[in-house]
């Protein structure tokens, strides 16, 4: 199936699924949601509203909130909080400007950040963290550290599936798919939170911009340096309307990963995935 991706009408299929997901068809919608829950083994007792009747559409269900007490955000001052629930695809050090996508598959920071060498240079030999959100997962994205939004770059692209099979077979997948690169200024330096789109994902949404829509001009750069948009660690910054992928980038020698976090391991948002190394704690 993964070999067929380049031949499929990715954007058309995604628009159709996105449209269907907004429909409010009463009992039919509830029946479909129940099938989805059963197929993926979703624990609705974690949801803020476990009753299926609370969700008038698939989109409302996909973007459901969880009970806050089930996802406490790490409290240690220097800790980095996981931005999502999901599976760690890969993580570790950036070798020069090369990141690992999967075994025998690499891509570059420059390509990931829209072919902008000046942005890429800030993360050379830094660290990266890639998490996959499966359809069953909670789809909201949260802030790993306290920070101020300075820029968002929307990069149009393909909509390949980002499931594990595709990641292992589609070259440079994350640098080819549509994505929103969100750059934050933190006490620890620059941090990138990258929201990668995928086939059948209704849309990428951020709390400051709403739905991120491709433009005819191609890459769109949104400057927020004068807006003073700040987030605390653990605050929501966006969501997907299906599963997808989130990538974190940090500059060289600024963080250390939690040794308990390893590729293929599962994570929950708010968990400790690492520690910053520049903040002086009083």
From Swiss-Prot:
Its main location: membrane. The keyword Cell inner membrane does not apply. It catalyses: a 1,2-diacyl-sn-glycero-3-phospho-L-serine + H(+) = a 1,2-diacyl-sn-glycero-3-phosphoethanolamine + CO2. Its cofactor is pyruvate. Is synthesized initially as an inactive proenzyme. Formation of the active enzyme involves a self-maturation process in which the active site pyruvoyl group is generated from an internal serine residue via an autocatalytic post-translational modification. Two non-identical subunits are generated from the proenzyme in this reaction, and the pyruvate is formed at the N-terminus of the alpha chain, which is derived from the carboxyl end of the proenzyme. The modification Pyruvic acid (Ser) is found at residue 244. Belongs to the phosphatidylserine decarboxylase family. PSD-B subfamily. Prokaryotic type I sub-subfamily. Catalyzes the formation of phosphatidylethanolamine (PtdEtn) from phosphatidylserine (PtdSer). Heterodimer of a large membrane-associated beta subunit and a small pyruvoyl-containing alpha subunit. This is Phosphatidylserine decarboxylase proenzyme. It comes from Coxiella burnetii (strain RSA 493 / Nine Mile phase I). The lineage of its organism: Bacteria, Pseudomonadati, Pseudomonadota, Gammaproteobacteria, Legionellales. The gene is psd.
């Amino acid at each position: 199936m993964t070999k067929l991706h380049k031949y499929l009408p990715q954007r058309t299929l995604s628009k159709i699924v996105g449209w269907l997901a907004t429909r409010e068809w009463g009992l039919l919608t509830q029946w479909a949601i129940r099938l989805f829950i059963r197929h993926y083994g979703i624990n609705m007792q974690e949801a803020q509203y476990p009753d299926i009747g609370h969700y008038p559409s698939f989109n409302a269900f996909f973007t459901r909130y969880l009970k806050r007490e089930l996802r406490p955000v790490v409290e240690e001052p220097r800790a980095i909080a996981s931005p999502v629930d999901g599976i760690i695809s890969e993580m570790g050090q950036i070798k020069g400007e090369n990141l690992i996508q999967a075994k025998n598959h690499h891509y570059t920071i420059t390509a990931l950040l829209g072919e902008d060498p000046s942005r890429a240079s800030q993360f050379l030999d830094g660290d990266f963290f890639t998490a996959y959100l499966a359809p069953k997962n909670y789809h909201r994205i949260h802030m790993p550290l306290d920070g101020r939004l300075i820029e968002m770059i929307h990069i149009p692209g393909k909509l390949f599936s980002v499931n594990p099979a595709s990641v292992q077979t589609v070259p440079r997948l994350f640098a080819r798919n549509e994505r929103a690169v969100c750059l934050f200024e933190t006490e620890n330096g620059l941090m990138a939170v990258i929201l990668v789109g995928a086939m059948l994902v209704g849309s990428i949404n951020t709390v400051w911009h709403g739905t991120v829509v491709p433009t005819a001009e191609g890459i769109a750069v949104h400057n927020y340096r004068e807006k003073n948009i700040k987030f605390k660690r653990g605050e929501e910054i966006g969501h997907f309307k299906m599963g997808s992928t989130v990538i974190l980038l940090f500059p060289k020698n600024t963080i250390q990963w939690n040794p308990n976090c390893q590729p293929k391991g599962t994570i929950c948002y708010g968990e400790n995935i690492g520690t910053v190394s520049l903040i002086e704690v009083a």
